[in-house]
């Protein structure tokens, strides 16, 4: 919509292969929401004690998330605050579907996908986040290492 032109599901290049390894890339914008999250990453859904999602968490691909102890994270909107996930569990959201041009698992039917989404909405996502009028925000937080890498790329831009 013209009144809210940010569309969060547009894919942009996040890394470039150079000499056998990948270098993270970032797209910068005057609109904070349009700045991309660089590099290969993992996305986890974090669940509170009630079993509902409290946030999603982005980490670099190499990072391991351990929720056995309080896990420090960065809220990109308030990075100066020291925040921790405590008494939480997590689930990695991304799954490898294609490798070397070949499927790694059979495709799901439309009905399987529909059923999976309905189950998630019913048992994992707060009703307050699902309403159309004044929905609560679903937070997207970052590991400290991932946040530092993103800020380093932003601060080292030429121009």
What are these regions (language model features)?
Residues 2-159:
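Gly/Ser/Thr/Ala-enriched C-terminal appendages of enzymes
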């Amino acid at each position: 919509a013209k009144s809210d032109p940010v569309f969060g599901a547009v894919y942009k290049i996040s890394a470039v292969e150079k000499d056998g390894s990948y270098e993270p890339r970032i797209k910068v914008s005057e609109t904070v929401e349009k700045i991309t999250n660089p590099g290969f990453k993992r996305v986890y859904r974090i669940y509170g004690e009630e079993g509902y999602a409290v946030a999603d968490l982005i980490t670099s691909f190499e990072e391991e998330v351990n929720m056995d102890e309080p896990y420090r994270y960065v809220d990109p909107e308030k990075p100066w605050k020291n925040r921790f996930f405590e008494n939480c569990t997590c689930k990695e959201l991304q799954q490898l579907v294609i490798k070397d041009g070949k499927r790694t698992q059979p495709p799901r039917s439309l009905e399987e996908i529909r059923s999976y989404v309905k189950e998630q909405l019913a048992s994992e996502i707060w009703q307050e986040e699902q309403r159309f009028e004044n929905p609560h925000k679903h937070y997207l937080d970052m590991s400290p290492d991932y946040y530092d890498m993103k800020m380093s790329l932003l601060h080292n831009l030429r121009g």
